[in-house]
A protein has these predicted regions:
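Conserved helicase motor core of SF1/SF2 NTP-dependent helicases
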Residues: 4, 9, 13, 23-54, ...
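A basic/glycine-biased coupling hinge at the interface between accessory DNA-binding modules
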Residues: 47-187
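Amphipathic alpha-helical surface "interface" segments used
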Residues: 133-143, 160-164, 199-201, 304-318
Length: 470
């Protein structure tokens, strides 16, 4: 069904899960969640009734990867991002403009700033309006992702994931006024964070037969509660909704609860997978040490790997005196490794990706840059470049994570604009966890100058090396 990929052990049980109701599958990195999601999708699509099946994920690169390994001609199986689904559905009910339907983040910040300036003039003595605009952007985004539409809803709301931002209950009314004014000012009907709410509302009054009998969400931890609610509402009442997620990778999210997301698991058990089919025990041990950091946000649903299939060397951390020396070593190492294995270089942002790409090109290396239109494959001997976010769900034989220097990682701009430095550091640390757990064999990390405060330096599950001696 998936080329030479076959379900192993407990994974086979996912194929026999009921074709009705809600199912939640949680697993460690490397436990095969994406593989299980695809097996379930193909199994459902091949039922005698030939039901329509939708697989939804957040990451464009992962869409390309899933489509490639599925390699199926099943016309009743679709794989797409949430926002493609949302635009398509709203278009089907005549609610998606041909142009300027969705406001971009820059436009969102502009209109919120306009609303804030107007409020300052109208209520000059109100101290709430002296808070940074980033606090208002984040709070409005929280309201959108949780589908809050009235002041009463907001006043009653449990601010999941926002506890570190101190907003007194009596001051919530001022944030809601900015939210109202923002919605009144913008000319676009939606932004990227509230489009799920409008999809959900349209579905509530849509009496047409549902297009999809079964919907499967992969990398579900990246979805907001309203995204999940809207997808559940889009499923035929006699169909099924399946959620596959890794609670150790709550990067974008809302730290969503099952209740807030509309997932009914009272009558369904949560499936937990702790067998790691990707990472060697050495890398899993190092990844576990990342989760032991004081910066890590603890989660009661965390699944710790207990069994390991692969074998491999310890991860290695290499220190260089200068950035130039670090980059020179990276070029030579990648050149050698590319002849026999799949390799990915994971960087913090696109600017660093571009810098590394130029250096590689000058030295005769032509890397493939992973983005929403291009995935990476462990079976292809090649060199890939990716950001931390774009590499989610993918795997490679060798992973290189350069520039783990304190002035680069964590991202200083992210910290400066954060409403909660504690939360921002937790999210940055989870990026390192994601990157490290992409490896099927080798994990090479490097830095110049001072090592990042987020690196688990006290771990005994990695080796150190001095780049000047290599």
């Amino acid at each position: 069904m998936l080329g030479n990929i076959k379900p192993e052990g407990k994974q086979k049980e996912v194929l026999a899960l009921p074709a009705t109701g809600h199912t939640v599958v949680l697993g460690t990195a490397g436990s095969g969640k994406t593989t299980m999601a695809l097996f379930r999708a193909i199994g459902l699509a091949n039922l005698p009734s030939r039901p329509n099946v939708l697989v939804v994920t957040f990451n464009g690169a992962l869409i390309q990867y899933m489509s490639a390994i599925t390699n199926t001609s099943l016309r009743n199986l679709r794989i797409e991002t949430y926002h493609k689904f949302a635009r398509g559905y709203l278009n089907s009910v005549g609610k998606m403009p041909a142009w300027n339907g969705i406001l971009n983040p820059e436009g969102k910040e502009y209109y919120i700033s306009q609303a804030l300036e107007a409020a300052k003039k109208r209520w000059p003595e109100e101290s709430t309006f002296k808070r940074p605009i980033s606090v208002f952007i984040d709070e409005i985004t929280f309201m959108e992702r949780f589908g809050i539409e009235t002041l009463d809803d907001y006043l009653r709301a449990e601010r999941i994931g926002r506890a570190s931002v101190n907003i007194k209950r009596e001051n919530r009314k001022w944030f809601y006024k900015i939210y109202e004014e923002y919605r009144a000012l913008r000319v676009n009907p939606y932004d990227w964070d509230d489009i799920a709410l409008y999809v959900y509302k349209e579905l509530q009054s849509d009496t047409r037969p549902r297009l999809y009998n079964h919907i499967i969400v992969d990398e579900g931890q990246d979805f907001s509660p309203m995204m999940i609610k809207s997808l559940i509402a889009a499923v035929d009442e006699n169909g099924s909704f399946s959620f596959f997620g890794d609670v150790a990778q709550q990067i974008y999210g809302s730290r969503l609860s099952w209740r807030d997301s509309g997932i009914n698991i009272r009558d369904s058990k949560i499936w937990r997978f702790d067998k790691n089919y990707r990472n060697p025990a050495t890398i899993s041990a190092f990844a576990k040490d990342i989760t032991g950091s004081v910066y890590w946000e603890k989660d009661s649903d965390m699944v710790t790997p207990t069994n390991f299939i692969a074998k491999g060397p310890k991860p290695v951390l290499i220190h260089f005196a200068t950035k130039e020396n670090e980059l020179a070593w990276l070029i030579e190492q990648v050149k050698t490794s590319a002849l026999a294995s799949s390799n990915v270089v994971i960087c913090r942002n696109r600017a660093i990706i571009d810098e590394v790409n130029r250096a590689f090109t000058r030295n005769g290396i032509t890397p493939t840059i992973i983005n929403k239109n291009q995935a990476g494959f462990a079976s292809v001997k090649d060199v890939y470049l990716s950001t931390f976010h774009a590499v989610k769900g993918l795997e490679f034989e060798n992973v290189f994570i350069p520039f783990l220097s304190d002035d680069i990682f964590p991202d200083k701009e992210i910290l400066e604009n954060a409403t909660s430095v504690e939360r921002a550091l937790a999210d940055e640390l989870k990026l390192l966890y994601v990157a490290a757990t992409r490896s099927k064999y080798g994990l090479f990390m490097s830095y110049h100058g001072t090592l990042s405060q987020l690196f688990p330096e006290g771990s005994t599950n990695y080796d150190k090396a001095d780049g000047e001696d290599l």
